[in-house]
């Protein structure tokens, strides 16, 4: 377990590691001189210097760069979900990635290593020695106000839970990507959705929540990276993209957004006055970033503050998608890849005369309970489809409040349900 002293040390040391790695791929300009000093790097080309270039500060040295390999327009590519995550991270102004390879998400790290963003945007990419190390690097980098992220799969994310709890308690923003596989234990490398409870209930110790986004396409894998960072920094809270092996490995057309410039140290100091940036740019006095508070009264106040923040997130950030609900008598509730399969089941069932609709939660936390509660007043029942033994069904039941039946259909062991199985489950619900 990290002590408060070690946690603070990480928060202070990691930004210098980030800046050191950034400077390897940059040219230098001293603020009091017009002379330019260029680093010598292979396969690296600098464009004309201008005032539109991204600006970094390291002590009294101003670093500006603009690179020829950065495409400013949208780009359309055929990508795996994992590859889309990596490319979107580079384009959304991510400062650093710290991860460890594990099937079925290893392509995230592999793609970043292949693209070498440290030579284009200055983004740091580091393979940590373990998942435990990577989440604590996230703590340190996020504590400096940087946009930092990690990715893993179910057993690896389980190892990160202590660090995620620390980040939530210290109110440090950051992005965790979980490309789920089957469990428990080492389980299988096949897809699953069995980490729902862990993600939505706060898998570590204490009363906390993580903002959870569930993509159902490769396009959403890309789109949710920037969205997750935006929400994480808006609320000073960890955010998670909860995907699975199906979405991570499937290939689809993706429209990647234009490059968003990484923020300067001055911009970070302005936007994140709480950050330990180490540059003397803070807008207020010394700030200790920690989840530790030994005085019970102060700890209660801190927890009440967190709960108020979570209330605001619930009020403002619920996201969901609906299909064919206008005349629906029964509603399938599913997220991620299970929602894609359920959509096909819904379309086939309607051809057979069944009035079925689809409700897809996009934010698993905050969960769209009020929306489901309203739908329950006009339908006859819900079928919750998951690739697990039944986890989201409890949130659906809480939302419906017993007004109509709520049943579950799922497959285990890395096996995904097929549309015909879902239709049979719908017919049983009708009886």
For the regions a protein language model found, what residue spans apply to each?
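Generic long, charged, amphipathic alpha-helical segments
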Residues: 342-375
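Glycine-/acidic-rich phosphate or pyrophosphate-binding loops and their flanking alpha/beta elements
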Residues: 80-84, 307-330, 343
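Thiamine diphosphate
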Residues: 107-201, 211-233
């Amino acid at each position: 377990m990290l002590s408060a002293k070690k946690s603070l040390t990480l928060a202070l040391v990691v930004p210098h590691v980030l800046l050191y790695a950034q400077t390897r791929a940059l040219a230098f300009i001293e603020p009091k001189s017009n002379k330019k000093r260029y680093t010598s790097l292979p396969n690296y080309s600098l464009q004309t210097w201008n005032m539109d270039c991204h600006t970094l500060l390291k002590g009294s040295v101003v670093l500006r760069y603009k690179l020829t390999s950065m495409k400013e327009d949208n780009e359309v590519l055929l990508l795996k979900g994992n590859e889309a995550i990596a490319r979107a991270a580079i384009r959304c102004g991510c400062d650093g990635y710290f991860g460890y390879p594990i099937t079925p998400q290893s392509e995230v790290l592999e793609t970043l290593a292949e693209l070498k963003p440290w030579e284009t945007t200055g983004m740091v990419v580091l393979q940590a020695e373990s998942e435990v190390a990577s989440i604590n690097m996230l703590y340190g980098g996020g504590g400096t106000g940087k946009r930092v992220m990690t990715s893993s799969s179910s057993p690896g994310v389980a190892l990160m839970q202590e660090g995620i709890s620390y980040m939530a308690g210290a109110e440090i923003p950051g992005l965790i990507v979980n490309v789920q596989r089957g469990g428990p234990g080492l389980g299988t490398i096949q897809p699953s959705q069995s980490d729902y409870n862990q993600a939505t209930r706060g898998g570590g110790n204490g009363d906390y929540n993580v903002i959870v986004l569930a993509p159902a396409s490769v396009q959403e894998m890309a789109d949710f990276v920037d969205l997750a960072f935006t929400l994480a920094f808006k609320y000073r809270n960890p955010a998670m993209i909860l995907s699975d092996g199906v979405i991570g490995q499937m290939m689809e057309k993706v429209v990647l957004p234009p490059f968003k410039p990484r923020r300067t140290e001055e911009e970070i100091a302005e936007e994140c006055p709480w950050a330990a940036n180490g540059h003397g740019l803070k807008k207020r006095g010394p700030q200790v970033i920690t989840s530790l508070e030994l005085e019970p009264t102060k700890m209660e106040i801190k927890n009440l503050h967190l709960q108020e923040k979570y209330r605001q997130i619930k009020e403002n950030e619920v996201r969901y998608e609906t299909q064919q609900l206008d005349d629906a008598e029964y509603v399938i509730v599913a997220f991620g890849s299970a929602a894609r399969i359920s959509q096909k089941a819904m379309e086939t069932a309607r051809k057979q005369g069944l009035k079925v609709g689809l409700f897809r939660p996009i934010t698993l936390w905050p969960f769209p309970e009020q929306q489901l509660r309203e739908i329950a007043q006009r339908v006859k029942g819900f079928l919750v489809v998951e690739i697990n033994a039944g986890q989201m069904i409890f949130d659906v039941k809480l939302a419906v409040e017993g007004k109509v039946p709520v049943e579950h259909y799922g497959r285990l062991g890395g096996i995904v349900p097929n549309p015909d199985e879902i239709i049979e489950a719908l017919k049983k619900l009708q009886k």
